[in-house]
C-alpha cells in the first residue's frame, strides 16, 4: 500500500516500509515527524513498535509528539506503558499533552493514576488535556477523581470537580456537595455546575443554601440557581421566588433564578395541580 505524502509542496507516494525507514533513519526531523503523522493515519498496527521506539529515543520533541499522537490513533494498548512514561517524564510540554490525549483514547484502569497525577502538572495545558482524557475514559476514573477533591492544589480540585460532572457518576454527589464549602471560589463554581449535570435531587437543599447565601460570590449563587433549574425540584420554587421578589434590581443572579423558576413550574405544573399542594395559578410569572 502506498500513501501520498506532501513534501515541499510536492506530493510523493510512499509505501508503508518507506515511511518506517523515514521514521527510523532520516536525518531530517521534518521527514521523521511527517512519517510518524502519516503512519498514525494509515492505521497499520505494524507501525506500533517503531513508533514506540521513536517516542522513547528520538531527541526531537516534535518527532516524539507525533509519535505519541500516532500511537493514540492506532489504539494498540502495547503502547500504554510507554505513553505513561512519556506523560510522567518527558520534558517537552507538547509531548506530555499528546501522551495524555493518547492515553484517553487507549483507556483502561491502568491509565487513570498517571492521568490523575498529571492534574498537578506544572503546565496548565497538560492539566486540561489530562482532565479531558479522564472524562473520555469515564466511570473507571471516578474513584480516583473523588479522592482528588481533597488535593492540596486548587487547580487539581477544580479539574477533578469538572471531570466528575462530565462523567456523570452519582457516587460523586456527596463529595461535590462538600466542595460547595471549598475556600476557593473557582472550585465552588465548578461544584454547582457539576451538581446540575449529575442531576441528583439530594443536592437540592445544599444548592438552595448556596443560592440564598448573600455573602457568597454572585457567580456561585447564579450557578446554584441554574443547577436548580436543571434539577427541576419543587422544593426550589419558593426560595427562587423569594430571591426574585426581594431583589432591588434584576441582575444575572435574579435573571437566572427567574429562568429556573419557570423551568421548574413548567416541569411540575400538572403534578402540582393533581396534588393540590400549591395555590399558585399558572401565570406568566406570579
Task: Name each model feature, range by range.
Residues 27-28, 59-60, 91-92, 122-123, ...:
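Short inter-helical turns and helix N-cap capping residues of alpha-solenoid HEAT/ARM repeat scaffolds
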Residues 129-135, 140-227:
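Eukaryotic tandem repeat interaction scaffolds
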Residues 38, 70, 102, 133-136, ...:
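Core register positions within helices of long alpha-helical scaffolds
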Residues 56-136:
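A generic tandem-repeat structural signature
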Residues 9-23, 44-56, 76-88, 108-120, ...:
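Amphipathic alpha-helical scaffolding segments comprising HEAT/armadillo-like alpha-solenoid repeats
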Residues 35, 67, 99, 130, ...:
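Conserved hydrophobic register position within alpha-solenoid helical repeats
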Residues 1-41, 46, 285:
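N-terminal alpha-helical scaffold/docking segments in eukaryotic complex subunits
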Amino acid at each position: 500500500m502506498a500513501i501520498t505524502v506532501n513534501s515541499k509542496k510536492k506530493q510523493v507516494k510512499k509505501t508503508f516500509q518507506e515511511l518506517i525507514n523515514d521514521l527510523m533513519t532520516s536525518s531530517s526531523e521534518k521527514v521523521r515527524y511527517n512519517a510518524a503523522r502519516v503512519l498514525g493515519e494509515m492505521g497499520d498496527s505494524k507501525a506500533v513498535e517503531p513508533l514506540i521506539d521513536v517516542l522513547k529515543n528520538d531527541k526531537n520533541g516534535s518527532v516524539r509528539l507525533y509519535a505519541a499522537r500516532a500511537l493514540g490513533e492506532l489504539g494498540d494498548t502495547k503502547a500504554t506503558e510507554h505513553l505513561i512514561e512519556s506523560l510522567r517524564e518527558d520534558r517537552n510540554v507538547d509531548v506530555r499533552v499528546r501522551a495524555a490525549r493518547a492515553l484517553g483514547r487507549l483507556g483502561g484502569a491502568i491509565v487513570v493514576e498517571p492521568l490523575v497525577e498529571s492534574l498537578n502538572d506544572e503546565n496548565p495545558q497538560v492539566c486540561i488535556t489530562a482532565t479531558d482524557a479522564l472524562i473520555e475514559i469515564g466511570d473507571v476514573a471516578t474513584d480516583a477523581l473523588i479522592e482528588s477533591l481533597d488535593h492540596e492544589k486548587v487547580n487539581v480540585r477544580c479539574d477533578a470537580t469538572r471531570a466528575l460532572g462530565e462523567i456523570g457518576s452519582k457516587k460523586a454527589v456527596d463529595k461535590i456537595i462538600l466542595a460547595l464549602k471549598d475556600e476557593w471560589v473557582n472550585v465552588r463554581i465548578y461544584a454547582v455546575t457539576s451538581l446540575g449535570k449529575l442531576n441528583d435531587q439530594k443536592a437540592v437543599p445544599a444548592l438552595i443554601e448556596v443560592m440564598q447565601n448573600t455573602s457568597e460570590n454572585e457567580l456561585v449563587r447564579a450557578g446554584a440557581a441554574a443547577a436548580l433549574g436543571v434539577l427541576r425540584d419543587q422544593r426550589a420554587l419558593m426560595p427562587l421566588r423569594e430571591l426574585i421578589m426581594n431583589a432591588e434590581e434584576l441582575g444575572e443572579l435574579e435573571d437566572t433564578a427567574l429562568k429556573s423558576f419557570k423551568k421548574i413550574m413548567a416541569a411540575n405544573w400538572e403534578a402540582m395541580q393533581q396534588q393540590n399542594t400549591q395555590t399558585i395559578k399558572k401565570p406568566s410569572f406570579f
